[in-house]
Amino acid sequence: SPLARAVETAQPLAARWRCEVAIEDRVAEIPSPTDDLAERAQWLQRAMQGSWSELAQASQTWRQALVDALLAQPSDCIIFSHFVAINAAVGAATQDDRMRIFAPDNCSVTTLDNGDGKLSVEALGVTAETHIN
C-alpha cells in the first residue's frame, strides 16, 4: 500500500532483504466518500456492519481492483496492507460478502494463495479488537 503506515512497516524487512519496496495502489485502504476524518470514521463504522453489496459501486470497484492485484501476483510475495483491504481479500477468497470477516491485529500475517486463478485463504492472521478511524 502507498499509505505511510504500510510503507513504514515494510521498511525493516526490505532493509533486511536488501530490496526495494514496490508500491501497489490497489491494496491501499478503502476510499471513503468524504475527506473529513470524523465523517469517514462514521461511514466506515456503519459500512463495516454490513456487506459489500450494500455499498456504492465505487467501493465494489475498489474491492475488485484489490482482488485483481492479488490474482496478478506471479510469485510468492509479502503485501503490507490494511484492515478493510485484508477483510476484502479474505471475503473474496471465501465468497463471503460481509465487510468484516475478522479483526486482523496490527502486523499480523494473513496468508492467501492465488493458484488456479482464484484466491484462497491458507491462514488468517492474529486478531485483536481494532479501533476504526
Which residues does each predicted region cover?
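Short beta->alpha connector loops
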Residues: 4-5, 93-95
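Active-site signature of alpha/beta-hydrolase-fold catalytic machinery across serine-
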Residues: 12, 88, 92
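Generic beta-sheet signal
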Residues: 75-84
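Domain-level recognition of soluble alpha/beta enzyme cores
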Residues: 96-120
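A polyampholytic, Gly/Pro-enriched intrinsically disordered region
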Residues: 40-54, 118-131
